[in-house]
Amino acid sequence: GAALEMKFKEKLDNIESLMKSIEPYEIARTEKIRQRLVESLSSIPEVEYDRGRLEQEMIFYIEKLDINEEKQRLTHHLDYFRETIDSEYGQGKKLGFIAQEMGREINTTGSKSNQAEMQNIVVMMKDELEQIKEQVLNVL
């Protein structure tokens, strides 16, 4: 039991550090998106557009790609998983449900990540989570 608990905590820590390693890419991609849109518009000189409207649309687009909520919920699920393994035994199904929720947040992060580096990190997070799910089956 103790070895399994240590394995869970190691994998949870790995997911958490991978999630934090996304942040530099997340900040840079917002600026890249803005630059790409501005360059695209300036490459078509005859197009006139309302600059204020463009800023509104860019904010809307960037908000759709924002992953702060997913990161916040994933952090909560990681903490809840830790609390659950620290509590009484017989929590296998509950751990399975929490792992499912972590998977949803990781998948949504991947869907919103339109940058190869971020998607690579998401794949690594999925790999760590898959190992957790395999170990949860040993607890059931």
Annotate each language-model stretch with its function:
Residues A2-L140:
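N-terminal intrinsically disordered, cationic/polar leader segments
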